[in-house]
Swiss-Prot record:
Keyword Transferase appears in the UniProt entry: no
Keywords associated with the record: ATP-binding, DNA damage, DNA repair, DNA-binding, Nucleotide-binding
Pfam name, any one: MutS_I
GO terms of molecular function: ATP binding; ATP-dependent DNA damage sensor activity; damaged DNA binding; mismatched DNA binding
Name of the protein in its database record: DNA mismatch repair protein MutS
Record-level GO BP terms: mismatch repair
Role played: This protein is involved in the repair of mismatches in DNA. It is possible that it carries out the mismatch recognition step. This protein has a weak ATPase activity.
Binding sites annotated in the UniProt record for ATP: 618-625
Encoding gene (name): mutS
A cellular-component GO term for this protein: cytosol
Length: 820
């Protein structure tokens, strides 16, 4: 810029320097303005007008619409800084001071319409010390604070993908050194990258921040001793939140080590392949296991269900406790319905507690908390005389201090609370001795106005004279213009209108001063009382959060009981055996999408001492993929403590589930279909154990027939004969040669998707039966897909030629394909 900057633009540049990579919204009167590149971004993303002044691009949004526009920007991954102007007292001259008082980023949301109701919203910091990686993540909206440490990038990436943060924080050197890790994360997650000063990630700075935040002199009590990279990440994250984003951190829970409790591990690829949270194709959520299982009534219960779905239990005790509770509520139908109704009245206790702790709560939020806590007492009343299962014992014994708080909120507040403190009418008259007195004065003012209006009408003889109020004028007397000369001299003219004149009197002015004084006093008093009430609630925050956890647990098991009742699910036997036996099992998602009674159930029997691997053959569209996915989903549900869609089941606890299903190019990685397939299969071979469940669909199909067959057989042999890798495996394949493995290994059993023929046309039965498939019916599927009839006919001719004796492999060579 060649021209001299105005004082206001100098001020903008100072704020922009502080905002860094954030889009700066700069308050100018009743608008928030953006300049230069920020103006272009604002105009492009919000569809607002871009203008120029002195060759400076600018665009703006009304101050009254700020929150909605900011949410739109943040939802697109932008970080936004808000520069507010200080109150300018009347008559003051010069430039109004402006400072940044808020920075909003995708991961650091305390209260926003962007917060997913039944999912966490994490900001995650990552750091490296030597070969160790430390991470720390926060959900500011509920105060959850997690840390972890990993010695390899694979486990690090898997952990971050499970947490699914919306914002990632580190320093420049880490981003440069670990570009490959960041690239992988960006391929799996929609994530905003944020950069922070490197010194905040140093041990001395990080520990000091943690000590200050939690008012301790040692981190050993949190179990963090020796976890230097994790401590560095945690301290830097706190510094970023408090010092950079200017957000409160006093409400955070003490840091907990993520993954300390062992879970059934489901890697990101398997979560996607099994469509746990969202379908691979179609609308978001619909067709996923989460959508089928989601019967929760509270946000806390919904978050618990989602987290448990991708982190099922490995501890048998945890599984059994929840199964017992599901069974209890399945049998108690009337109680279940009552609890469902009462749970639906409980709002997000965790996020309400956070809003109150961070001074962001409105009176309406306090009313929501009150109503939710009252609903919790009704739930407790309904449970107190029940012989509850162990999982829920004593969880709804509401502590006396919390009972006292609930009583205060129930008796001392007005039922319908306002959105803003400034609107008043928050507390009952008896809450404070001055409330009733001031309210009476304010209320009596209405009758005084009516009496005064009637009196001066009689005195002046003007029957249409009115006493009115306007924000700009205050109280005034209005008469028609032609009647104004009839008013006495003590009437003081205030304003002339087209057909009316407005006046005041000394008496009316004196009344106005008294009323305004009362209103100011009343607002000041209620504001003070509201702050004191919020502080009183914050003192009970831990008890509220404990009750919130109890509500989430109850909601979780009641919702699973509701699901079991709706679809006639049965309780699986889960134990430490290596059994996998399912009678009349059904795919939980497909079951809900088909007409009742049309889904064909199938059995599964696997045992390490007998069948460890099922080789599944059959044509496309016959149900192979549905069947093998079904087994994995039923195991996941069982280890969540849920009942499952089966007549009966015996499931030995599984430690990991791996899937290799389908294939697709990953152009962003520069990986072909076959490379993706091989990379995912390699991951399975390296990480599967004897207690794992492996689902493989069409391994080796992305290369030549014999290459693919050789790879497929080598994978089968590895999983059958390598100590520590003998996972239960379901392998769907079109390679008929592999079915001969059954003759060479007692742990392999052939099954196929049954097809009947009618006049040469296949009829898919969707039954999985013993033996291998004789035909693939691929040409029939091509015909169903709409191939031109000439192409179908030619394919049949070529197939007959291939099946002729001249093109069949020699017996010796064919036999070599199945030799170990």
């Amino acid at each position: 810029m060649t021209h001299k900057l105005t004082p206001m633009m100098q001020q903008w540049h100072q704020c922009k320097e502080q905002a860094g990579d954030c889009l700066l919204l700069f308050r100018l009167g009743e608008f928030y303005e953006a300049f230069f590149d920020d103006a272009l971004i604002l105009a492009q993303n919000l569809d607002i007008t871009l203008t120029q002044r002195q060759n400076v691009p600018m665009s703006g949004i009304p101050a009254t619409c700020l929150d909605g526009y900011v949410d739109r920007l943040v939802s697109r991954g932008f970080k936004v800084a808000i520069a507010e102007q200080a109150d300018n007292t009347e008559g003051s001259k010069g430039l109004v001071p402006r400072t940044i008082n808020r920075l909003i980023t995708p991961g650091a949301l305390l209260s926003s319409s962007l917060l997913p109701e039944k999912a966490n919203n994490y900001v995650l910091a990552i750091n490296q010390v030597g070969s160790l990686y430390g991470l720390s993540c926060l959900d500011l909206s509920i105060g959850t604070f997690l840390v972890a440490e990993y010695d390899n990038t694979k486990d690090l990436i898997e952990a971050i993908c499970r947490l699914a943060p919306t914002e990632l924080l580190s320093h420049a050197k880490f981003y440069q050194k670990n570009a490959a890790v960041i690239k992988q994360l960006q391929q799996h997650l929609r994530i905003t990258l944020s950069e922070y000063v490197s010194w905040a990630f140093e041990y001395q700075s990080a520990t000091k921040k943690l000590y200050t935040c939690f008012q301790v002199s040692s981190l050993d009590g949190f179990g963090l001793q020796g976890l230097v990279p994790a401590i560095n990440a945690a301290g830097a994250l706190l510094s970023y939140i408090q010092d950079k984003l200017l957000l409160p951190i006093s409400h955070l829970s003490i840091p907990k080590i993520y993954g300390q409790q062992k879970h059934l591990l489901i890697d990101k690829a398997s979560q996607t392949n099994l469509e746990l949270l969202s379908p691979i194709h179609g609308e978001h959520g619909k067709g996923s296991l989460l959508q089928v299982m989601e019967r929760t009534s509270t946000p806390m219960g919904g978050r618990l269900l989602r987290n448990t779905l991708i982190n099922p239990f490995y501890d048998l005790k945890e599984i059994t406790l929840r199964q017992d509770s599901v069974e209890f509520f399945l049998q108690q139908e009337d109680l279940r319905k009552i609890l469902k109704r009462q749970l639906s009245c409980v709002r997000d206790l965790e996020r309400l507690a956070t809003k109150i702790s961070t001074s962001l709560a409105t009176p309406k939020d306090i009313g929501t908390l009150r109503d939710s806590l009252l609903s919790c007492t009704h739930i407790a009343d309904n449970l107190q005389n029940c012989a509850l299962p162990e999982f829920l014992e004593n969880k709804f014994l509401i502590a006396p201090p919390l009972c006292s708080l609930i009583k205060t909120l129930s008796t001392e507040l007005i039922q319908e609370l306002p959105l803003k403190v400034s609107e008043g009418n928050i507390f009952a008259n008896h809450y404070h001795p001055d409330l009733l007195r001031l309210r009476n004065i304010k209320e009596n003012s209405k009758s005084w106005i009516l009496e005064y209006q009637e009196r001066i009408r009689n005195e002046t003889g003007i029957k249409k004279l009115k006493v009115c109020y306007a924000q700009a004028l205050g109280y005034y007397i209005e008469v028609a213009s032609n009647l104004a000369p009839q008013l006495p001299k003590e009437f003081i003219r205030r304003q002339s209108r087209l057909h009316a004149e407005r006046f005041t009197t000394q008496e009316l002015q004196q009344f106005q001063d008294e009323v305004f004084s009362v209103e100011d006093k009343l607002q000041t008093l209620e504001t003070k009382l509201f702050k004191e009430l919020c502080f009183y609630i914050v003192e009970h925050r831990d008890l509220i959060l404990k009750l919130s956890t109890a509500v989430a647990d109850l909601d979780y098991v009641v919702s699973l009981a509701e699901l079991a009742a709706e679809y006639d699910y049965r309780r699986p036997l889960v134990d430490h055996s290596d059994a996998l036996s399912i009678t009349k099992g059904m795919h939980p998602v497909a079951l809900t999408l088909l007409d009742k009674g049309t889904f064909i159930p199938n059995d599964t029997v696997m045992h390490s001492a007998q069948t460890r691997m099922i080789l599944l053959t059959g044509p496309n569209m016959a149900g192979k993929s549905t069947y093998i996915r079904q087994i994995a989903l039923l195991v996941i549900m069982a280890q969540m403590g849920s009942f499952i869609p089966a007549r009966s089941a015996h499931i030995g606890i599984v430690d990991k589930i791996f899937t290799r299903i389908g294939a697709g190019d990953n152009l962003s990685k520069g990986m072909s279909t076959f490379m993706v397939e091989m990379a995912e299969t390699a991951n399975i071979l390296h990480n599967a154990t004897d207690r794992s469940l492996v689902i493989l669909d069409e391994i080796g199909r992305g290369t030549s027939t014999y290459d693919g067959l050789a790879i497929a057989q080598a994978v089968v042999e590895f999983l059958l004969f390598t100590d520590g890798k003998k996972a239960k495996t379901l392998f769907a394949t079109h390679y008929k040669e592999l079915t001969e493995l059954e003759m060479h290994c007692q742990h392999v059993e052939n099954f196929h998707a049954m097809v009947k023929e009618n006049s040469g046309q296949p009829i898919f039965m969707y039954e999985i039966v013993k033996g291998h498939s004789k035909k693939s019916f691929g040409i029939h599927v091509a015909k169903l897909a709409g191939f031109p009839l000439s192409v179908v006919s030619r394919a049949q001719q070529i197939l007959h030629q291939f099946e002729g004796p001249d093109l069949r492999p020699e017996p010796e060579k064919a036999q070599q394909l199945v030799m170990f």
